[in-house]
């Protein structure tokens, strides 16, 4: 809330003096059909554009089973793992820098933020004294994310513009919580790096720009923290896959 208030206070004086460009639609006979106001007409002239975002997400682990699991399954026993799609939420700030003159389609975006999520894996035991028993392992984390992204945007059409975005996102687990350590024995590494790409839409309003953006993230590192327990021994690697809807305000 304080960040949003600060953004409005920063933008207020400039927007009070902004110039708007009006587009007039006329019929073949010259009659006026309507007038379209171009909001924030001087927006491209800004070299640096700050903002904030809130982003609901859904994530799951991409799982590779271990050789020990394959050997156990061949002997009629073992534990099978299945990742569950889990919701999350991210909040943060936006720093957007223009790369070139006012007409360049390229922008560099740095968007540090925090992500809160609890990821889960279901383990099904077979032939180990608890046939077909399902145990769920949960890993709750608060992550500091530092994405560095390249944005390629189309020409503006009145008050809308589409864009593509992609880059690299380092991620660091600030906290990692296990509600019941006797049950939740699975742990993951605290650092990760992800490949990100997506598409978005810029919508220009009189006092701000709103940009819904759909972004996909794929972890490049194996974040499994190997421990000597039944759950870790059945896994070879864990990688993060996430789909996030960013709601950007600049």
Each model region followed by its residue ranges:
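Residues on the lipid-exposed face of transmembrane beta-strands in outer-membrane beta-barrel proteins
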Residues: 37-41, 52-56, 89-97, 112-114, ...
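Residues that define the transmembrane beta-barrel architecture of outer-membrane proteins
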Residues: 44-50, 85-89, 140-144, 160, ...
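Predominantly the C-terminal beta-signal and adjacent terminal strand-loop region
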Residues: 190-192, 197-250
